Amino acid sequence: MSATLALTEQLIARASVTPDDQHCQQIMTERLAALGFECETIASHGVTNLWAVKRGTDGRDGKLLAFAGHTDVVPTGPLEQWTSPPFVPAHRDGKLYGRGAADMKTSLAAFVVASEEFVAAHPDHRGAIAFLITSDEEGPATDGTVKVVELLQERGERLDYCIVGEPTSTAELGDVVKNGRRGSMSGELVIKGVQGHIAYPHLAKNPIHLLAPALAELAAEQWDAGNEYFPPTTWQVSNLHAGTGATNVIPGHADLLFNFRFSTASTVEGLQARVHAILDKHGLEYTLKWSVSGLPFLTPRGELSGALEHAIRTETGITTELSTTGGTSDGRFIARICPQVIEFGPPNGSIHKIDEHIEVRFVDPLKNVYRRALEQLIA
């Protein structure tokens, strides 16, 4: 069994459901400390975070490549639906099964073993290697990576490159990497009406009827055309509720929850202003609360994307696709302190599902791609 596969199994065996790290980071810390990493645990409200760094011969002047990821996993769902226990690594038909196999304990193991091999081959490496690991990525993400980033900002720490080990591949390892992500902004809209008897609508104001024309306009609006890297911004309703449950009462208010997934072609302020303008045009009486969970970020083609594309092509023969599709990730926080952030990891077809797994044939090539990136960027 390869070192990467063995470490992956060791991590899967830890039932590290958010925010419980279950000592996964301790396992990683022991391996990294043996390589000369300075390891720091940063705890916050039950969340465990790890910042580990090994400087090269250039000291603080050298380029720094960080590996970022999470030890936490999503809940298993009904245990009886799993073919084998989710926290007991199991091999079947060339696949390794277990919660976190794809998202993202294989990436964590590959990070560690790639670093071990790199340091052994390049003991006098010039640049620095760092690890930024959290147990709060699958949950609220309020005490994890964002807290470490804030601390690093206070210290004036500079990151030059960051590889986030999210499972970005689809059919084959390396066919897709993420060089950016869309922003996410949600709104809680309350339309005010006047409750009344449904037989006397002239004595009431139906907030559903009042909302309907504005809702149709919002749904049909083209917010932007996207750009070279991003698809057009989308606006979607996630929840709509009104009424008491009775069939003879006009509701007094209607509650609407919606979400924007937006590109760098739009801004928070611009999107908010356009929503308010549409609501105001229709003469609605309303309250609207906004929350922004992440801003869009983009890493244009450059040193990091080039290194990963070359490493993937050399290792797998695949020409990778740069993509910004999908949901948010911790990359949105890291982009605050790092100009080049790219996500790359194993295929994502089974993530968050019953019987999550990774094909064993991808495990060591993933490690090799990470090692090749180290060699190209900081050796």
Swiss-Prot record:
Please give the biological process terms from Gene Ontology that the record holds.
diaminopimelate biosynthetic process; L-arginine biosynthetic process; lysine biosynthetic process via diaminopimelate
Instruction: Give the UniProt keywords, A-Z.
Output: Amino-acid biosynthesis, Cobalt, Diaminopimelate biosynthesis, Hydrolase, Lysine biosynthesis, Metal-binding, Zinc
- Binding residues for Zn(2+) 2: 103, 138, 352
Metabolic or biological pathway, per its Swiss-Prot or TrEMBL entry: Amino-acid biosynthesis; L-lysine biosynthesis via DAP pathway; LL-2,6-diaminopimelate from (S)-tetrahydrodipicolinate (succinylase route): step 3/3
* Needed cofactors: Zn(2+); Co(2+)
Identify which top EC class this enzyme belongs to. hydrolase
* Top-level taxon of origin: Bacteria
Q: Which GO terms describe its molecular function?
A: acetylornithine deacetylase activity; cobalt ion binding; succinyl-diaminopimelate desuccinylase activity; zinc ion binding
For this protein, what reaction is catalysed? N-succinyl-(2S,6S)-2,6-diaminopimelate + H2O = (2S,6S)-2,6-diaminopimelate + succinate
Q: What does this protein do?
A: Catalyzes the hydrolysis of N-succinyl-L,L-diaminopimelic acid (SDAP), forming succinate and LL-2,6-diaminopimelate (DAP), an intermediate involved in the bacterial biosynthesis of lysine and meso-diaminopimelic acid, an essential component of bacterial cell walls.
Q: Which family does it belong to?
A: Belongs to the peptidase M20A family. DapE subfamily.
Quaternary data: Homodimer.
Protein name as it appears in the record: Succinyl-diaminopimelate desuccinylase
